[in-house]
Amino acid sequence: MATPVKVVEILSAEDLRRTLTRLASQIVERTRDLSQLVLLGIYTRGVPLAELLARQIETLEGINVGVGALDITFYRDDLDQIGLRTPAKTSITLDLTGKTVVLVDDVIFKGRTIRAALNAVNEYGRPEVIRLAVLVDRGHREVPIHPDFVGKQLPTAKEEVVKVYLQDWDGRDAVELVGY
């Protein structure tokens, strides 16, 4: 990839904390029965985001919700464009039938990752409802997918990149917009 021309901080560590608190509150408000809630993080950054949201929901409501990790590598329709990577391990230890599943991802762009995730989820049961939570929605959809919970709407140019940094993975919390 080319050298970045411009890097702009979109969310600081404190902004990110507040955004996750708001997302967790919105998920709680829209979920009838929290005991049936499962957060499925999509590799890579969606996994720690799902864990952070689960902790925040526990803080808010005093209930542990189910958390899993979903690798959608073999469900993608654009492998020829993005290339095949070594798959991560999907970790879903419960039947999703009848559950309220919230797919969690860091950034939604074209929508293809979420389309693949919807296909993958069906292998683990038939949820009552599937919702989508994203930290950043940057637009430019190529498929008709719309998130239910959005931390930050961020109009971008197609060639720009949104980078999400999380303490447990990257040593810092921030969201940056990178222009090339």
Swiss-Prot record:
Reactions catalysed according to its record: UMP + diphosphate = 5-phospho-alpha-D-ribose 1-diphosphate + uracil
- Gene3D superfamilies noted in UniProt: 3.40.50.2020
Q: Name one GO biological process term.
A: regulation of DNA-templated transcription
Q: Where is this motif: PRPP-binding?
A: 101-113
Q: What class of enzyme is it?
A: transferase
List, alphabetically, the InterPro entries matched: PRibTrfase_dom, PRTase-like, PyrR, PyrR_bifunctional
- Sorted alphabetically, which SUPFAM superfamilies does this protein's record hold? PRTase-like
Q: What is its EC number?
A: 2.4.2.9
What UniProt keywords are attached to this protein's entry? Glycosyltransferase, Transcription, Transcription regulation, Transferase
Q: Kindly give the CDD domains that the UniProt entry links to this protein.
A: PRTases_typeI
Q: Name one GO molecular function term.
A: uracil phosphoribosyltransferase activity
Q: Does the keyword Ion transport apply?
A: no
NCBIfam families listed in its UniProt record: PRK05205.1-5
User: So what family is this one in?
Assistant: Belongs to the purine/pyrimidine phosphoribosyltransferase family. PyrR subfamily.
* Function per UniProt: Regulates the transcription of the pyrimidine nucleotide (pyr) operon in response to exogenous pyrimidines. Also displays a weak uracil phosphoribosyltransferase activity which is not physiologically significant.
Protein name, please?
Bifunctional protein PyrR
Q: Which taxonomic lineage is given here?
A: Bacteria, Bacillati, Cyanobacteriota, Cyanophyceae, Nostocales
Q: Which gene encodes it?
A: pyrR
